[in-house]
Swiss-Prot record:
One of its GO terms (biological process) is maintenance of CRISPR repeat elements. It comes from Flavobacterium psychrophilum (strain ATCC 49511 / DSM 21280 / CIP 103535 / JIP02/86). It holds the Pfam family CRISPR_Cas2. This is CRISPR-associated endoribonuclease Cas2. Its EC number is 3.1.-.-. HAMAP family: Cas2 (MF_01471). Homodimer, forms a heterotetramer with a Cas1 homodimer.
Length: 115
């Protein structure tokens, strides 16, 4: 019973960060800037969900704020970028489809955080 209670609370305390962006890519320089922004997201542990949507699991709100701050510090000069945090419970309720075929959502892997 304790494990069920802890897991339930954890689903509401752990978060997913979603980063949505639309960056200009008309010139070679703009494409390079957009590519560098994507690389920074990947280097910070984000995974590509769709081409301009990246996601990352965070064990706590404090951890999510650290990663959100890193995004703020690496914003390109032009383009539109949105950052949203949702609970693990909300993320688990997402319905995914490839065409008309439903797809199960991935469970976050166990992560070890060292300070």
């Amino acid at each position: 019973m304790y494990d069920e209670h802890y897991t339930r609370l954890n689903q509401y305390r752990s978060l997913w960060i979603l980063v949505f962006f639309d960056l200009p890519t008309e010139t070679r320089k703009e494409r390079k800037i957009a590519s560098e922004f994507r690389k920074k997201l990947l280097d910070d542990g984000f995974s590509m969900f769709q081409f301009s949507i990246y996601i990352r699991f965070c064990a706590s709100r404090e951890n999510a704020e650290v990663h959100t701050k890193r995004i703020r510090n690496s914003l390109p000069e032009h383009g539109k970028i949105g950052v949203m945090q949702i609970t693990d419970k909300q993320f688990g309720m997402m319905e995914l489809f490839y065409g008309k075929k439903p797809v199960e959502t991935d469970k976050p892997s166990q992560q070890l955080e060292l300070f």
